[in-house]
């Protein structure tokens, strides 16, 4: 019986118990030997119903799965991996989480220091591997009684305190020396080293560091009584669902124009802004606003972003985290606050709308888009009518590239419907895994929509979807390549070979390989009939929508061109 292998478990016990106290309920575990102390302690927490463990064979997909869970729960999610390139595979998801302030905690097992840099197998330099993306990089010493258990608990908890206040990623690198197996449970739990923590260990809610959270109540701007009488525009980017409540009514009372991103979960009073803002007359008149207030960030629309770039008046930014959000270098007033807290201390003054043209053009776009999209099942019509494929109490996850732009431009969703995206770095990697994490953690019917290249990029994450035991429907929009690049002014031959990457793949055999249902509808009636069956199953379904390669991008460009040329009185 090895005392060292048991002590490795005791060391891991302190680390994981510290995480529990700050909201970690899920451990996402990749297979590996060096991480055994962490894995077995996580399983012990699952056995006592204090946490739930999940596994996947690909660390990159596992990390995005964890990100999806963090999005759905708004809690920190821990990832356990072994040493070597397993750690490096987490990087894309950690970048995304860092840019969107979602809480991930990486526990990377490592070789002990004496085995680094000397040619030992599966040993790389792991400390600092994620550069400055984590808010805390903790490189622990090799598990040893030379360090007090209280020091270890305090070190982990302090990182968690920081994460509670600012979101983002924590990296904890934990070297373990062999042996790693054949432990004694009694020895793990009753080592004298743990004695100072006994009262802490038996109370899962007791914290070693009782840090008070920063209570910085937002105050009313000293000149709000002046600004609320002026002409204003409110722009809402990505927001948590609960923060969007009340923004529409607040804007309507003020008589201000409200432009909402599809990620805002706010009912759009002026939908299709990405289309109607292409009209230069309306764009210029909207620039006559005295003040713009922006809630949230990660705005998708190119036209809305252009408006923000062109606006030179008073600019206020409201965001709950102390991060720098100023892509257009505005002279700005920053409010570190949740949106609904800001509204509470800035009462509106009832006024008539100061600009009517956006409403008129938005209403025109509603009928015009319907006419242009038509009744066939295609990329644009699915984006325009996406609400018709959603469950009443479900989630929508939208991938990147062309389709997310089409949804933002052409769709109007009900107030408060949960919409998830990966728009921090806006990559196409890990999208299916992220959707699977959202579906798993929320327990609600979930629809995800990705392009064919995105699906190919994350193909093995369909394995994660196959484990979901409630309706989870993955739409693959197959336009035989990267259709978003049709928007680029690149010579056709070069575009085809190095941008679009056209193919003739289809996804029926992929679904068969992972043992999930597959449907390929050709009409809206066919889709709705088959979706009814899919929602009746407690499992995942792939819906492949095969479309002509340039139809979506051509319609998008045509709508923008026609509305840009419309004459406004």
From Swiss-Prot:
GO terms for molecular function: 2-succinyl-5-enolpyruvyl-6-hydroxy-3-cyclohexene-1-carboxylic-acid synthase activity; magnesium ion binding; manganese ion binding; thiamine pyrophosphate binding. It comes from the Bacteria. The keyword Oxidoreductase does not apply. This is 2-succinyl-5-enolpyruvyl-6-hydroxy-3-cyclohexene-1-carboxylate synthase. Pfam families: TPP_enzyme_C (PF02775), TPP_enzyme_M_2 (PF16582), TPP_enzyme_N (PF02776). Binds 1 thiamine pyrophosphate per subunit. Its cofactor is Mg(2+); Mn(2+); thiamine diphosphate. SUPFAM superfamilies: Thiamin diphosphate-binding fold (THDP-binding) (SSF52518). Transmembrane segments: none annotated. Homodimer. Belongs to the TPP enzyme family. MenD subfamily. PANTHER family: 2-SUCCINYL-5-ENOLPYRUVYL-6-HYDROXY-3-CYCLOHEXENE-1-CARBOXYLATE SYNTHASE, PROTEIN PHYLLO, CHLOROPLASTIC. It comes from Haemophilus ducreyi (strain 35000HP / ATCC 700724).
């Amino acid at each position: 019986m090895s005392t060292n292998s048991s002590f490795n478990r005791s060391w891991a016990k302190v680390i994981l118990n510290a995480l529990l106290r700050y909201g970690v309920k899920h451990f996402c575990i990749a297979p590996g030997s060096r991480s055994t102390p962490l894995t077995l302690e996580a399983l012990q927490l699952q056995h006592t119903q204090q946490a739930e463990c999940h596994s996947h064979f690909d660390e990159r997909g596992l990390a995005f799965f964890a990100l999806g869970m963090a999005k759905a729960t708004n809690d920190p999610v821990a990832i356990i991996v072994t040493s070597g390139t397993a750690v490096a595979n987490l990087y894309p998801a950690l970048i995304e989480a860092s840019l969107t302030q979602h809480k991930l905690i990486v526990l990377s097992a490592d070789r002990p220091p004496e085995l680094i840099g000397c040619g030992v197998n599966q040993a790389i330099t792991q400390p600092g591997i994620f550069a400055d993306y984590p808010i805390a990089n903790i490189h622990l010493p090799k598990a040893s009684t030379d360090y007090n258990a209280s020091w270890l608990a305090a070190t982990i908890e302090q990182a968690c305190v920081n994460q509670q206040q600012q979101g983002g990623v924590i990296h904890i690198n934990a070297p373990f020396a062999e042996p790693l197996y054949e432990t004694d449970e009694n020895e793990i739990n009753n080592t004298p080293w743990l004695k100072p923590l006994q009262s802490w260990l038996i109370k899962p809610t007791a914290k070693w560091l009782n840090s008070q959270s920063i209570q910085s109540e937002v105050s009313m701007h000293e000149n709000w009584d002046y600004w609320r009488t002026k002409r204003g525009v409110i722009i809402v980017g990505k927001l948590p669902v609960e923060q969007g409540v009340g923004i529409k009514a607040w804007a309507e009372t003020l008589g201000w124009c409200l432009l909402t991103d599809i990620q805002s979960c706010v009912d759009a009073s002026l939908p299709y802004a990405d289309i109607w803002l292409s009209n230069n007359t309306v764009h210029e008149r909207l620039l006559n606003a005295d003040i713009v207030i922006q809630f949230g960030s990660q705005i998708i629309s190119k036209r809305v972003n252009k408006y923000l770039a062109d606006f030179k008046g008073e600019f206020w930014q409201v965001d709950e985290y102390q991060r720098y959000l100023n892509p257009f270098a505005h002279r700005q007033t920053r409010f570190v606050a949740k949106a609904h807290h800001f509204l509470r201390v800035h009462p509106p003054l009832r006024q008539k709308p100061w600009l009517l043209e956006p409403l008129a053009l938005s209403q025109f776009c509603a009928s015009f888009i319907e006419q242009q999209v038509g009744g066939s099942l295609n990329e644009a019509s699915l984006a325009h009518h996406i609400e018709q494929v959603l469950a009443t109490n479900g989630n929508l996850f939208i991938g990147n590239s062309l389709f997310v732009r089409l949804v933002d431009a052409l769709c109007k969703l009900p107030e408060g419907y949960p919409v998830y995206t990966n728009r921090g770095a806006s990559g196409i990697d890990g999208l299916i895994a992220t959707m699977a994490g959202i579906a798993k953690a929320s327990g609600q019917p979930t629809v995800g929509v990705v392009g064919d290249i995105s699906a190919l990029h994350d193909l093995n994450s369909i394995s994660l979807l196959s484990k979901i035991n409630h309706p989870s429907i993955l739409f693959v929009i197959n336009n035989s390549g990267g259709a978003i690049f049709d928007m680029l002014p690149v010579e056709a031959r070069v575009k085809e070979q190095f941008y679009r990457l056209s193919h003739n793949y289809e996804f029926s055999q992929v679904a068969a390989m992972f043992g999930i249902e597959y449907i390929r509808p050709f009409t809206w009636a066919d889709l709705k009939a088959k979706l009814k069956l899919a929602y009746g199953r407690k499992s995942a379904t792939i819906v492949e929508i095969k479309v002509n390669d340039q139809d979506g991008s051509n319609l998008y460009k045509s709508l923008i061109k026609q509305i840009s040329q419309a004459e406004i009185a």
